[in-house]
């Protein structure tokens, strides 16, 4: 099986790396947080002293980092990773970043004889742990076919969105819609509650009606309506407000670059920005319900 280097062992990267180990891959890992590195090493991964050291002898390099700036620094800046990667290696970046950044890094990788895919994911930490992630891939079809067995060890659905950067664009579109959807659902549930409706009954009605949506079915923002969702544990865990705000910011950047109109996306961005500024940045994004409820 392929020798893999995995860089970035945070809330998403760590369970993804563990699933590769479970699938039998030889894994060398690196993270700037020593505790995260040590945890994967205990599970069978080989800890590297640096990112460049981790890619020595690797056939596939995977990164999962927080933002565009981190990906740029790793591959193009102070991380100096690209020169350390052997020609012919496949590079897969699973971070959610600006499409322009993905294109720039892929171009630099190609200049060094490397194939690179942008492969952001959907499914959250639960999907990462259960190996049911959706991979949204941009890059050459041949590179994707080479990556498919590895991605299949970490996820359930794999889509080829198009050329380099297309995976990021599709992911941004999806998350913009999700942010809008959650804010709208929170508003509808709050309206129903204010008018005397049982929110659980209202949710059941909407699930069987034209307002049906993913958030309503599996991620209800109202505490107590669903078990095992962030709303029923004080909005702890899940997908943070600040992460949603980051993705809505990426959508705004993409819209500006292409002169696309996203009025609802911008409104959602403003709402999550207000929510974050009020101290909710680390809470799950479904906590936008609290902002709606606080409005007078």
Report the location of each language-model feature.
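NAD(P)+-binding Rossmann beta1-loop-alpha1 motif at the extreme N-terminus of oxidoreductases
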Residues: 1-64, 89, 94, 125, ...
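Rossmann-fold NAD(P) dinucleotide-binding segment
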Residues: 51-63, 67-115
